[in-house]
């Protein structure tokens, strides 16, 4: 992807919808957190404003699993109605709390690996009583209801029709992170417009969407149709979107690990871990393939950037290795990723691409502000 700001692009930036999507992946959320810290730093530099935050620049921020937690951290307001966490605060959060969230407690074959109590405790401490409607920009955080067998998407823009989705952010964050076999499912209740109790029985958003890019685009489309701020956009299409999608890495050793001959001998237990990884990798690859194809077909390939490390090895591939050594390794993975080429066909580095993306976000924000002042 090469983000070039042409005169025609600049003229339409004010009418574009900006979307940030963050994948799930447990402790591997440190990788996109590293990218977010770099991007927010670039936005602060471009606009000469140390208080600039990602929520100031994106119309929709979507996340699933650990990506949902990152979404909440950068959109939940503090007492000054600014994001309670800057991007640079996210990695310290993982280092401070990751080892306790993923604290080993023996062998668990018939129950979740972790009890989730510390995770819920820290979410309540950090997010307080904040609800979805208070988010500083539109959010799209996914989960899956095991009772209704349907995905649940928590957003601001649809609360008038579905007020029961105006849940507390800590309930949402625990739910989107409650990966089956790792954490217990989460039950909580809200109220409908009639005052009736509405029950949720939720597990990890990765069950519905490991890569929430398409979900985030759907929310952005509805936002453009219903929000008066986007009245000038008659019919939103991919040419009017800037989409930044952040992955949590895929296992480069996975393809070497299994063969059809070996898998033919597997039973339920042997399939559990590989099947989860296969499903996650396939979902991520297919979303990226689809989006790349569509944006390119519409001559809008400059509007989409997928930042993903496809060469994870060793402990860096694990969902829950929160040892200090592995977390340091994941930070290094994120920092090294910035120096890598966007693709085999595009030798521009992610660092350069993100700098250009930051400039586009800044220009678009200024154009919209100028338009609003008239």
Swiss-Prot record:
Any Gene Ontology CC annotation: vacuole
Xref: PANTHER family: PATATIN GROUP D-2, XYLOSE ISOMERASE
Single GO molecular function: nutrient reservoir activity
Domain PNPLA per the UniProt entry, residue ranges: 20-217
InterPro entries named in the record: Acyl_Trfase/lysoPLipase, PNPLA_dom
Assigned protein family: Belongs to the patatin family.
Active site (catalytic residues): 204
Swiss-Prot/TrEMBL keywords: Glycoprotein, Lipid metabolism, Plant defense, Signal, Storage protein, Vacuole
Free-text tissue specificity from the UniProt record: Tuber.
Listed Gene3D superfamilies: Cytosolic phospholipase A2 catalytic domain
GO process terms (BP): defense response; lipid metabolic process
Intracellular or extracellular location(s): Vacuole
Lineage: Eukaryota, Viridiplantae, Streptophyta, Embryophyta, Tracheophyta
Signal peptide residue numbers: 1-11
Residues linked to a glycan: 48, 191, 257
Modification note: N-glycosylated.
Organism: Solanum tuberosum (Potato)
Free-text note regarding domains: The nitrogen atoms of the two glycine residues in the GGXR motif define the oxyanion hole, and stabilize the oxyanion that forms during the nucleophilic attack by the catalytic serine during substrate cleavage.
Keyword Glycoprotein listed: yes
Name this protein carries in UniProt: Probable inactive patatin-3-Kuras 1
Record motif GXGXXG, residues: 24-29
Other noteworthy facts: Patatin have a dual role as a somatic storage protein and as an enzyme involved in host resistance.
Main subcellular localisation: other
């Amino acid at each position: 992807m090469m983000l070039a700001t042409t005169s025609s692009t600049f003229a339409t930036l004010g009418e574009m919808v900006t979307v940030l999507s963050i994948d799930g992946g447990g402790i591997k959320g440190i990788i996109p957190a590293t990218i977010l810290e770099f991007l927010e730093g670039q936005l602060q530099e471009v606009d000469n404003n140390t208080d600039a935050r990602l929520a100031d620049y994106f119309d929709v921020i979507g996340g699933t699993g650990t990506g949902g937690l990152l979404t909440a951290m950068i959109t939940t307001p503090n007492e000054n109605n600014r994001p309670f966490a800057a991007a640079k605060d996210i990695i310290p959060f993982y280092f401070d709390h990751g080892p306790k969230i993923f604290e080993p407690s023996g062998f668990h074959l018939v129950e979740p690996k972790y009890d989730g109590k510390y995770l819920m405790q820290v979410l309540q401490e950090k997010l307080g009583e904040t609800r979805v409607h208070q988010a500083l920009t539109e959010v799209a955080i996914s989960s899956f209801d095991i009772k209704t067998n349907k995905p649940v998407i928590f957003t601001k823009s649809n609360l008038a029709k579905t007020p029961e989705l105006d849940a507390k952010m800590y309930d949402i964050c625990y739910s989107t992170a409650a990966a089956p076999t790792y954490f217990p499912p989460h039950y909580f209740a809200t109220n409908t417009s009639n005052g009736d109790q509405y029950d949720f029985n939720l597990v990890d958003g990765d069950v519905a969407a490991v890569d929430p890019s398409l979900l985030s685009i759907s929310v952005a489309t509805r936002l453009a149709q219903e929000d008066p701020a986007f009245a000038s956009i008659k019919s939103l299409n991919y040419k009017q979107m800037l989409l930044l999608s952040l992955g949590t890495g895929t296992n480069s050793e996975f393809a070497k690990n299994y063969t059809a001959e070996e898998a033919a001998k597997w039973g339920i237990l042997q399939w559990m871990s590989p099947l989860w990884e296969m499903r996650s990798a396939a979902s991520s690859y297919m979303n990226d393939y689809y989006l790349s194809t569509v944006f390119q077909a519409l001559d809008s390939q400059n509007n989409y950037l997928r930042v993903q490390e496809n060469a994870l090895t060793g402990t860096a591939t694990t969902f829950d290795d929160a040892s200090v050594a592995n977390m340091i390794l994941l930070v290094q993975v994120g920092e090294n990723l910035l120096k890598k080429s966007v693709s085999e066909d595009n030798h521009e580095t992610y660092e350069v691409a993100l700098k250009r993306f930051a400039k586009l976000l800044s220009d678009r924000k200024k154009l919209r502000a100028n338009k609003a002042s008239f």
